[in-house]
């Protein structure tokens, strides 16, 4: 099969299943920075060429034992703003949609490496916190509701930022 080149910022693989060949299993030291130890499995998708002209890299979440290869679903794209490549986040199918897939948790898990890069995390799932806000006027309770771009009406909420807890999100 011929190699396929992926453009930087491409999010078309979100939600898709890929096979990853692991070249840095859990516990492996970074080849250029031996003080960095991988707490998760890390590998690449054979045949998919990323912005660095190497095969597309994938962080594997949710499997604590060292692997050689694994089939995962891509749940997030880490776009490095000061680098020429993106990183993907993959999880086993049975973990898709669980809290490990939330943007705030992904950022915490990959911080061991991504702390050195300015980046954004585009995840399929994000943890949100909402609040029921109301006031009373003339003995009647009035609720604050918002109408989003799709026309749905709901309570105000926001996504949990990296390092925040639920209360901090609500206050913000």
Question: Which positions does each model-derived feature cover?
Answer:
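N-terminal strand-loop-strand
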Residues: 121-156
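The catalytic Nudix box helix
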Residues: 155-172
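Short, glycine/serine-rich, charged loops/turns that create anion-binding
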Residues: 49, 65, 136-138, 150, ...
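Short, well-structured alpha-helical interface segments that form or flank functional binding sites
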Residues: 40, 126, 169
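Short, catalytically relevant binding-site loops at active-site mouths
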Residues: 27-29, 151-152, 160-161
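Alpha-helix N-cap/loop-to-helix boundary motif
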Residues: 14, 123-125, 162, 166
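Hydrophobic N-terminal alpha-helices or hydrophobic patches in metabolic proteins across all domains
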Residues: 2-122
